């Protein structure tokens, strides 16, 4: 179980955050994060939260509370910049590492790595990455735990995922929470062994009560399964694991 994005980092990166709006009060952190933590505790789950490095400066108490509750805080870029477009990735990864308290995991915003990303991650002390893909393995020696686009809440709810939805034979228009529930529950029912990643976004709980209900239902089922934090799953990956199967598409394609 993983959660992506916290706070206003992505909106600052895109230039959509109002200049007169104070920082450090984002609803995803102040309203939804405590509720998500409560749901995880209800089902005895420990999750991984991929947070942008900026959150280490804006929400240090919230990140520390996640760790205190047994969850992992990993890196999701500095301000949610599409990673395949980043030229100064070493500087951004180092800055995020320091701001987040030296995380060991990284998930590239928009899902794609650059050719040199694995080597930089290893150099900076990261032990795994989580790009888009369908099979876990080792990429240049780095544990790689991919996610599938259709197992992300944003794939269903956000307009800019239209290209990905159409590629997969789904409607271009955003889809309701019921479609997410059906697809994720089918994947969980079919899953018997190996690695499977689910991604939810705290800010997307604002889609409505049904979005919260879907998350609650998924967590209840995950609580009956062998559900690891990502750092634990990476540590369990054999040293001689083969190459991962990655997906080179992204939501900004």
Protein language model features and the residues they cover:
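Catalytic alpha-helical scaffold of carbohydrate-active enzymes acting on polysaccharides/glycoconjugates
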Residues: 1-105, 110-152, 178-198, 206-253
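Aromatic-anchored helix/helix-loop segment that forms the rim or "lid"
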Residues: 153-189
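Conserved strand-to-loop "acid loop" that flanks and positions the catalytic carboxylate
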Residues: 201
